[in-house]
Every structure is written in structure tokens, then in C-alpha cells.
Amino acid sequence: MTLTQPLQRSEPPRNSFLDDLATFASEHRAQHWHGTFAEFLENILPKDPTRFARSSHQYLYDMLCWYRDANTVFDDPKLSAATDLFTHDLFGIEPALTRVTDYFKAAAAGSDVGRRLLLLLGPPSGGKSSMVILLKRGLEEYSHTDDGALYALAGSPLHESPLNLIPASMRGRFRDTYGVHITGELSPYSAARLSDEFAGDFMKFPVERVFISEASRVGVGTYAPHDPTTADIADLVGSVDLSKVANIGDEGDPRAWSWSGAVYAASRGVLEMIEILKVKREFLYLLLTLTQEKNVKVSRFPLIHLDETIIAHTNLAEFNRFLQEKENEALLDRMVIVKVPYTLSYKDEARIYRKLVSSASAFKLVHLDPHVLELAAVFAILTRLDKPQREGLDLTK
């Protein structure tokens, strides 16, 4: 590689970019809404009751379908099950993308697959983290569309569905009227607020439209492993907020609880567990119970209903150590494992290099000889192939 003089290129007009930016903002401008539960039932729910009663798996799969319909249509059969959400950033792992898409399709249909934790397994830099990041960014954008409109109880740290307000004795009639089944339960926080602020009149409870945002901890939660000796399950489920206990006087009051755990941030969306097999066993059982039963149990409170999709990823070394312990067999049965290996296509490997080079500003003045990326990709692929067992064959044949 040698430094060369940059090519003289005509700069695109800035006014054109500003116009495109304004158009993008206009297209993605979502209408905020705030009202009572009575107004929600009268003005919002009748538009499409099924859409407003979606589970997290259904919501995520609808987002994937929205990307497939709203963006480029590919003729390549390898991409038939993948969506435009992935195809511009992930190369050479189409089988893994297909399996992930199929997982969400089956889970959205209500099959038992949705009661299993999705585990992405593969070597470092294989695309696992990038896949989860794209899913989170896709959810954020989808929630700003009309199709992805999401409504929650105003002020709830769990941004729970307004439909959870419907009493159990009335849910049968609700199903007959609107054609949807309610499975969620009101959280202790919202239940206490309903009693204290509204004297039990749930029709007056405020409802608002919310937008999924990792930065705002709405619909996206992330947990990264800590030192096992210092890791605290409070990072997942929260703990007593001692600063509030002094004013409230009761540690069992939901208002005295810190609802900052990752599982609460992920409610109605997705929880990413980074290097999940490095966490304590009690963490794993809590997550698997959450996946299967949609509930978590914390001290001083009854079961807390949470509807979220858990996506975990880990590397091969940690997974092999996990397999060696027999007591982990029951945990494996509750996981859907999707392998995300390195690509074995030199063309896809070269596309990865081209993407990395084009995104680095330092390479804009660097000349690359023709096919140099393809050549580097070939050598990289050869290091990933097993030695042939048949005599007379080598890795170049």
C-alpha cells in the first residue's frame, strides 16, 4: 500500500444533503400520544387490537418483516430468509441469519420455541455482537413507524402494556370483543400507583406512546459479565433503594425498589446477555425462568411479569467448558443454539475487508492494488480449513 494524491472529486451539494436529511426526519417523525386508558380503548386500540397486543417475539419478527418489505428485495436465494436489516453489514453467514429469522418466526407463532433462550455461538469477530446490535437498532427505528407503534403505562419503569390493566374477570369478554388474549399482569409498581393515585379506577390511568431506545433504557437491556466474585444479581433485577426507604419507611413498598435492572429495561423488547456462560449459575436459572414463564421473582414482591426476548452470545471456549459439567445438561435443553462461524467464502471475506477499509478515514488516501483484498481473503480462508484426510489432496484443490 502506498500513499497517493487524493482524486479530485466534485463535492455533492450540501443543500441536497440537507433536503434529504429533512425528508428522512419527516418520514421518521412519530406522533407522540398521551391520554388515559379510557381514551386508549376508545381511540387507539380499535385501529388494530392484534397489533397492540403483540408479544416481544411477535414485535421483533414483525420488525424483520417490515425491513424485508420496506427495503430492497433480493433475488439471491441465499438471502430469501434474511432481511435488509442484515445484508448490508453481515456477509457470509446467511445460514445463521436464516436460523435466527426462523427462530423468531416460530416464536411469534406461539410455538414452544419462544420459551427457549436464543444463544449465538461462534468465534470472536464472527458477527454475533453485530447481529444483536442490528436487531436493537432495527427495533429502535421500527418503533418510530405507524406499524411499530408501542404504547405503555405512563411512568412505568417496565413500560408495560396498558392491556395489563384489564381485570382477570373481564379478560374473557375483552377477548370476545377485540379478538386478542391478554397474558400479562400488572407490575407491583403500577398496581401500587393504581391504588394510591387513582383509587383503583384503572380507566383514569395515564397511557403514552413509547419509543424503543437503548440509550433511554426503553425496550433494550444489556448485561455484560463481571468478576464472578463481585457480580450482583441486582444488576439484573434491581434492589432496595435505601435513599427512598427513609422517606417511605417500608422496604417492601414498590416505590422503595430500584427498578434499574437490565430485565426491566428490556421489557417489551430485547435483553442482550454478553458472554452469558461467564455469569453465575443463579443468573442462568433466573434468565431461563424468565424465558419460560415470563416471570421473575425478587424478594418482598410477588412474581413480576416481563415479556421480553433474551438473546445471548458466547464463544466456543466458554461453551466447551460449559458442556463438560453434567449439571448443565438441563440448561442446554432450554436453549436454541445458533452457530455463527467464520465465513468460508473468500468473496464474502473480501467484502468484510472492503467494508472495514471504506469505514476507516485513514485509508481514504491509501492506494490498494487490484484484488489485494481478495488475495488476503484467500489466505484467511485457508487458515480456517481442516487438513484434508485423503492422500494427494491439499488445501488448494
Tell what function each PLM region has.
Residues 42-397:
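Conserved ASCE/P-loop NTPase catalytic core
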Residues 3-56:
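Long, basic/Gly/Ser/Thr-rich N-terminal segments
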